[in-house]
Amino acid sequence: MATDGASCEPDFSRAPEDAAGATAEAAKKEFDVDTLSKSELRMLLSVMEGELEARDLVIEALRARRKEVFIQERYGRFNLNDPFLALQRDYEAGAGDKEKKPVCTNPLSILEAVMAHCRKMQERMSTQLAAAESRQKKLEMEKLQLQAVEQEHQKLAARLEEERGKNKHVVLMLVKECKQLSGKVIEEAQKLEEVMAKLEEEKTKTSALEEELSAEKRRSTEMEAQMEKQLSEFDTEREQLRAKLHREEAHTTDLKEEIDKMKKMIEQLKRGNDSKPSLSLPRKTKDRRVVSISVGTEGPVTRSVACQTDLVIESTDHVKKLPLTVPVKPSAGSPLVPANTKGNVCTGAALGRPGIDRQASHGDLIGSSPPTVPPPSANRIEENGPSAGSASSTPPLPNSTAPPTVQTPGIAPQSYSQAPPVHSLHSPCANASLHPGLNPRIQAARFRFQGNANDPDQNGNTTQSPPSRDVSPTSRDNLVAKQLARNTVTQALSRFTSPQAGAPPRPGTAPTGDGGTCPPVGRTSLKTPGVARVDRGNPPPIPPKKPGLSQTPSPPHPQLKVIMDSSRASNAGAKVDNKTMASPPSSLPQGNRVINEENLPKSSSPQLPPKPSIDLTVAPAGCAVSALATSQVGAWPAETPGLNQPACSESSLVIPTTIAFCSSINTVSASSCRTGASDSLLVTASGWSPSLTPLLMSGGPAPLAGRPTLLQQAATQGNVTLLSMLLNEEGLDINYSCEDGHSALYSAAKNGHTDCVRLLLNAGAQVNAADTNGFTPLCAAAAQGHFKCVELLISYDANINHAADEGQTPLYLACKNGSKECIQLLLEAGTDRSVKTRDGWTPVHAAVDTGNVDSLKLLMYHRAPACRNSLHEEESESVVFDLDQGEESPEGTSKPVVPAELINHADREGWTAAHIAASKGFKNCLEILCMHGGLEPERKDKCHRTAHDVATDDCKHLLENLNALKIPLRISVGEIEPGSYGSDDFECENTICALNIRKQTSWDDFSKAVSQALTNHFQAISSDGWWSLEDVTFNNTTDSSIGLGTSSVRSIMLGNVPWSAGQSFTQSPWDFMKKNKAERVTVLLSGPQEGCLSSVTYASMIPLQMLQNYLRLVEQYHNVIFHGPEGSLQDYIAHQLALCMKHRQMAAGFTCEIVRAEVDAGFSKEQLIDLFINSACLIPVKQSPVNKKIIIILENLEKSSLSELLGDFLAPLENRSTESPWTFQKGNGTSECYYFHENCFLMGTIAKACLQGSDLLVQQHFRWVQLRWDGEPMQGLLQRFLRRKVVNKFRGQVPSPCDPVCKTVDWVLAVWRQLNSCLARLGTPEALLGPKYFLSCPVVPGHAQATVKWMAKLWNAIIAPRVQEAILSRASVKRQPGLGLATAKKHPSQGQQAVVKAALSILLNKAVLHGCPLPRAELDQHAADFRGGSFPLSIVSSYHSYSKKKGESGAWRKVSTSPRKKSGRFSPPSWNKPGLSEEGIRIKAVSQQNCNRNASLSKQKSLENDLSLTLNLDQRLSLGSDDEADLVKELQSMCSSRSESDISKIADSRDDLRRFDGSRNNPAFSTVNPRMPVSPKEVSPLSSHETTECSNSQSKIELGVSRVKSFLPVPRSKVTQCSQNTKRSSSSSNTRQIEINNNTKEEIWNFHQNEQVEKPNQ
């Protein structure tokens, strides 16, 4: 059993294994685990778990059994119960054969095999289990995902249901719409079919219209050609009609000439019959308007009050009641005639006054000066009115704003009416009742203050005082004398303190030294012998010649503003009680105060105690002050910085008076203005500074007993008389200081009284005495700008570096005041410029703070005293050069002398001078500071701000450009061939501006700057006026009026590197320019080489549009002729158009050739044929057309006959085809046909304004381009060209219109236009000039003489010969038809020579010299260089003109033949003044008042004789030749042109009379009429007796008799300015007169043929 059991054991163990393996294999074969369902998987899992449990049991059993077998084998414990084990043991222990196999398998091996198999199976099962678990997990995950997906599915299902419902609704709507659209589609399809049908119809119609349009175009071109032909025919007819019209006009002028001759004969006959009755009435009329004159023999009874030039407003009725010399009683209400109302009868009646136009005579004071005349109802005598007729002319003072001057009676003109004593208007009986009771003291005072009649004044002029009435004392009644004196004092006081009744002062009138030095409202320095001072004791009389009393001048008064009510003006002639008017200082301008005191009645006259005259006291009523205290009241100058001559001038005349109260307070200084206004009468009378008189502030009486106080007062007032008397006293402390520390020297220096300062310094006053604030007299004078006082104090060793308590030095105070003279004096004295105040300010700070450029220049540039005179000009020029040129330190300019430490010095707040200038916007000062090389613009103040941070916009721009590169921008037009076709004066390059390139500038900014600069330049040169590039607001158009713009640019060169607008480099523009050392930016314009005309436009200044139009005409018509006056650039235009066409054709692939031929008088038709044939322009008919383009230019066609030269080619040129051949006859008798092909272009140039004669037949076969001088492009070409030249000369800057260069260019333009206009009016179109000759005008800044010299050369070389040739050729047409023009030109007649010279003289003065910018003296030097200027212009200017305005008297003026004048007394003439006469000559004169019957009669007779003589001359000339008469008419019509300037409207003063060289020895004049010598006497105003003598001598001379010419000028009237049978009416200032006398023996011809002579009917 054991054996069986043993043997069966393996089978048993093997069976399950095999079964399991078979099952596994079957399972693998039959099914797949992955395909099992869930239930099958569960079942499989349970089976596998059961199998695992069974295996575990088997394993345990086998382990137990193995243990038993092991024990048996090991320890011999055998179990005999098992026979199989025994058999096995026997078998194994048997034979001992090792190779015997056991009978049965070892259980251990079986167990191991089973165990190994089990392990494998376990691993496999564990693997399958892990896979099953992972699948289970995945399954769980999938379950969760499935649940989420199901939820989502449910949601989506719900949504889909909703969407479905919505879509269903939409679908229903879409279905409806589809149905509707389907219906519409059907309708649209039907419509489309209809439209397509219509479109086909329209296409057919369009094609038909296109055919018709092409046919219409062909017809239009044909019609245009016909129109061109018709226009040419019209031009021809117009020329023919114009010639006919000229003939008719010539006939008409002949008839008019006959009519005028008849009229003149009738007028002469009438004048011969009516001469006697016609002379009496004007005499009465004239006398009615004349104010009586005072001859030298008249007595002093004619009364003149206060001044000699009072305004007299009087009607004819008033004056008619007065005889010639009227003794007027002293009544205050009657109208009075001033003592010096003599008008032009006086020898020197014109007082030199800058800026006043003819206000030297009384004509404009009496009825001819509306701005200065009160209403006629105010018949009054102006107390301190404007002086208009002082006797001696004095040099005018620079103060152009001072009030009018007043002339004193003591300086009346010599040998004429002597001035009567002046009395108060408020004392009618003063003159009649004063002589009883005069004591010797009064007589002595009278003798002293009246002065000697022949004492020379300070200017050396001896003045005559009138013969005073002998007021010898007849009674010694002192009581009566005292009472009369008191009354007189009171009334004089009330008079001088009453409101002034005077006309408003004329602006620009300056006070003069003598003959009118008394200021209008400052004081009345009048000699009043009839008003005596009251005897207050027995001191000795003042000797008349005491030193220091009358020989010391007092300063003139600056302008004062009189505060008065206009309603009181009419009461100025009578006694008027006016209330006190004390204006506070705040209501008046600085330095002007006027206080009109109250007039006190006679009952309040003070009882003056007898005291010495020098002991001044004021009574309680305050009515009288001693004459010594008030004899001289100095003027305190207005504190105006930069005055050329402040009030410390020494040019004023001193005329001490007995009682001279100041009618208004003198201008006070700023310090006195601050203290308040004083109402004291003493202040009103003397002008005493209120700051020195605190007791007078209340208006009550102030004792003045103290001598030091009197010294202060005299020094403050500038009272030299009182001051000298006080200084002569012993024991007087001249260094006494008042409470504020002001010494007398300080007060005198502060108020600018140079004479007082000199007296005090000579007396030993301390020159460096300081006041409480530490200011010395030098500080006070420098602070007020009194440079005379400063110079005097410096000469007395004043401390120039003295610093006040706050550290202000005199230099600092002068800079603060802006006084250039004081600064210069201090700098020359060697003052220290670096002294600082307590606030840290230097003089540079002070100068910059006031914005005074001149002061800053002096501080920075003033070096040595040697350059004192020329310093300012050099500095200003150098500074301007620096700024304009943009260079930091150009060679030759002065360098600043101040160190950089002073310029960069900072004050207490850290501000430098640059901070101050930048913050206040003082750009000029900042520029001067920036020119200093050591300026630190980045320096910061204590708030860390630079000058740029606090600067205004302008100053910021200046500071930003401080370190910028200034690169000139130039425009280049390429190479211009030298001498090519009139382009000699064209420039290749022109500088248009300077580009400021800063470090932060980008390429976009640079591109915009270049474009803007080009646009501005093109706009500027094509504008009408001188406008700055910055000031002009140009429109947004890219092209200018000449058609140029940024599109005209071909390329731009940055140095030598090409660049295009918008291009950017890696470097910035600033770095690029620095690295490449680019010194300029050049803009190249497109030219003919590119097929463009932009460069031609810029070179010639012809608008681009017109050049393109010319090019179109050439390409369209093939035959074009350019014609115009000589010098109209015809050749240049033709050549440039040919070049442009050539390059265009070459760009299109054609070959092109330009053939140029110059036509002269010998150019024959055969030569032209050879030219046409050789250039292949004229080809045989048999030959086919060539593709080569030929451009033929025929120049100077005016030198040949067009009809002879081109007559046979007209038809072939117009119709270029084989159908219009031209037959050429060869020399051998054969002929050949040629024709012009379409590729040939013919251009011609003619230097002639218009065609004449047979040449008109050629006109209709060519396209003519007329270049008129008065139309574009020639009209504005010269202006644009010269403006571009000026811009180039000024390095791109446009100068201001007032710059001399602009005036010179404008003058050249005016010369060209006026010259052509006059030549056109003269009927000589062949003499017209184009602008070419004027293109070479030199533009030299500051040297207008070069331009005038160039003009003289042009006139002599070109203009004058052309004019002479044209006039001679015209005169020769009628006179010498058989001899020809050449003979007439070689041998002109005397009449022709005279006409030529007259024409040249008129053209020279009318068109050339008129408006010349040179000063008068320089123009006189250059005038002789002009040929033809020696003809006397009075010949053509001695004819009359008519005016609508009547009412002028015969005024006496002199006429100069000069074209221009610059006189100090008269304003320059206006040639085109709108209010002047349209016809003839209108002479401006001042009406004459002081002439009597005899004078007027003599004038009329001499006038008639002169005019009859000119008429005879006129007839003699006209009888000689009719052709010359025509030219004469042209000359006179040219003179009387409305549109042109008038030759007679030239300078009208004797000093400005022009005398041309060669006028004395002129054969043309001496041979025509040798019987007329002209007196070489100078024309001068005549007195009455001289006029009478002249009239008596002249009345004996008959008409036409040879006699000596009268030296009286011919008076002219606006009504008839011809033979001077004039209508006499009221005077006017709008007339001028003809100068007859030229100081040469010349003949006076009257060229005016058609004058109408009127006889006087009044």
UniProtKB/Swiss-Prot annotation:
It is found in: Cytoplasm, Cell cortex; Cell projection, Dendritic spine. The keyword tRNA-binding does not apply. Keywords: ANK repeat, Cell projection, Coiled coil, Cytoplasm, Methylation, Phosphoprotein, Repeat, Synapse. One of its GO terms (biological process) is regulation of synapse organization. Residues 399-418, 580-590, 1559-1569, 1581-1595 have a biased composition (Polar residues). Residues 1539-1558 have a biased composition (Basic and acidic residues). This is Cortactin-binding protein 2. It comes from Felis catus (Cat). The lineage of its organism: Eukaryota, Metazoa, Chordata, Craniata, Vertebrata.
